[in-house]
Amino acid sequence: MTPYRFARFRRSGNLLLGLVLVTTLGVNLSWSANGPKKADFDALTRAGWEHFYSLEYDLALHDFEKALEAHPDDAAAVNHVLDTVLYRELYKYNALDTRLYARQGYIFSKQVPMDEAVKRRIKDLSERALSLSDNRLKANPRDVQALYNRGITEGLRSTYLVIVDHSWFGALHWALAARHDHEQVLKLRPDWSDAKTIVGVHNFVVGSLTRPVRLMAGIAGIHGDKNKGLRLLAEAGKAGGETSTDARMALALFLRREGRFEEALVIVRTLKQQYPRNFLFALEEGNLLYAEGKHEEAASSVRELLSDCKHGKYPNAHLEIAYFTLGQTLRAEGKLNGALAAFQSAASSKTSPPDDRQRALLAEGEISDLLANRQEALLEYRAAIALNSTSDEAQTARKYLDKPYKGN
């Protein structure tokens, strides 16, 4: 593939690939309700997922590691630990904020500076899980549970490669492997509803690519049907299996992509009620309302979320994401002073990674310019550039150092 064609493919598929790899927002994809119920119905694992769904990753990891000690040869138990270690890091650096994947090139610019020890652990866990599944499949190629477990491991490896390493082709390889394994599961066991989630997501993604890119993908043997993808996700979501939550979240994201906001809101509000301590599900309601153009309702939703955070409802909230969303909604309403205050809160949050802080500082500068506070704007642009002089945000800030921002 020529560099030009690769660039076209990357631009066309950026949002969609991002959605493929982060559809779960950190929700379990590692065990199938249709498979053997030996390891994952014990108290430790149940407690682990309760913490996981609440974004309490350290507590979840403690429980899953104890469960793995009791079941060292279970690939699903290894996947639970792998899943938690990976998503703890992604959440730490705000790489699970779905709204950001609508930004051109974001998935390739988002920085997740993992410690090398964590990277090694992720690699070791994924290789361990793959080895356990492969050994079972050597003994019985039709071992459906092993195929399912291997597909989960492959999907997690794909997520790591694209978001952390920014390795497009490596991620694509493992994503296709995950799809293939779960398609095999469905051939052997059509009633295995949990396998429909990955297959459904991939069908939607490939089916949504631009026609030229889809033709290129077809030549490479990669096919998809957008409507089939939505149908499979709806079926997996209604089945009530272990990927039901994942399927519903993916469905909501894709419905949002299709402009079917009200349908997506119904799903997200159900998830918000089902997981009352999950900060990201609560935030997604505000994101959807903002995307639909209901800015006043979006601002109200985010304010309620921030109030709940102050009262301890969400134990591991990243307030900077919520403040940034609030800033956007107020900016869209023309409430510039309120927007400026929200962006300032986003930039000063203790949990804000440098790239998110830079984004908030750039927004601060733009609002200051709109309010005719030129000196404040210059300070904010310079502060943004100082965080990372090579980013797109820095390039934009430099432009406004020379000429004030006047609005889009």
Describe every region a protein language model picked out:
Residues N14-N28:
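Bacterial N-terminal signal peptides
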Residues A33-L44, H51-D63, D73, V81-R142, ...:
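Short coil/linker segments at helix-helix boundaries
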Residues R46, H80, N149, L156, ...:
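"A position-specific structural signal for the A-helix of alpha-solenoid helical repeats
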Residues E69, H180, K187, G237-K238, ...:
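Amphipathic alpha-helical segments of tetratricopeptide repeats
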Residues S244-R256, N287-E296, R303-R357:
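Alpha-helical adaptor scaffolds
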Residues L370, E376-N408:
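Terminal, low-structured helical/coil segments at or just beyond the last alpha-helical repeat
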